Amino acid sequence: MKSEAKDGEEESLQTAFKKLRVDASGSIISLSVGEGPSVRASARTAADDTKPKTMCASKDSWHGSTRKSSRGAVRTQRRRRSKSPVLHPPKFIHCSTTAPPSSSQLKHRSQTEPPDGISGRGISTPKEFNAGENSTSLDVNHTGAAIEPLRSSVLRLPSESKTEELSDATQVSQESLTANDLSDFQSVSKLSQGKPCVCVGKECQCKRWHDMEVYSFSGLQNVPPLAPERRSLEDYSQSLHTRTLSGSPRSCSEQARVYVDDVTIEDLAGYMEYYLYIPKKMSHMAEMMYT
């Protein structure tokens, strides 16, 4: 009998806890409950202060697991598991030596640029163009450097056309105010837009065109020398050619063979090896696919 009564009491307590909402502070708010056992349970919990705090402090802390009130509001950054580096977009640092049109249109410094005029790549840039005097002096130095090779090229020419060339040189010096530097191809081509080259019809004495390397090809410098078989094939084709000049006309196949000897299949295979390197594994896989 006692055990049955205890079971009944436990059931009534459970139903009471289901129908009661208990705050974290321990104050009990009874929902509209008309049953007898629930009222009795609320009276019992009010009388016994120690039980409700341990058993039903709040809905979040049932089963001993404390749950955060704001679930998705503050979420900490999870540590990256992958070993690949985090790639950030590149930060461009613009540095040029030409003067800005006015002091109001100053260039905004990028945040990554260090304070003492040294850009991220280690190139020392001019401090900053706040004062117009610094920039103008820089520009004057540039134009002086630009005019010197021009004058040297002008002085070499014959004396008849000297006055004409001096006027050309002054015009070019005015244009070189806009050009950054004579070392790059674009600025030199801008310089020569005004008038045609002074030395048209004579030997070109414009020094800066000869010193400039517009395009540099690196791929064709490492070509292997001709194989000995190729040389022997060339000799063979020449002997065939001389033989046919004296003797009977050749057949079509012979003519074609002489023509092909110029660029042999071995050369083409070497070209494939050197320039279109196809890995062995890949070609094997391709063979397996297509057979």
Swiss-Prot record:
* Coiled-coil residues: none
Q: Quick one: where's region Disordered?
A: 29-139
Alphabetic keyword roster: Phosphoprotein
> Can you name the source organism?
Mus musculus (Mouse)
| Basic residues: compositionally biased ranges | 65-83
Superkingdom of the source? Eukaryota
InterPro entries of this UniProt entry? DUF776 (IPR008494)
* Gene Ontology, cellular component aspect: nucleus
One matching Pfam family is DUF776
Q: Does the keyword Zinc apply?
A: no
Q: Where is the composition biased (Polar residues)?
A: 95-105
Protein name as catalogued: Oxidative stress-responsive serine-rich protein 1
Q: Which residues carry this modification: Phosphothreonine?
A: T143
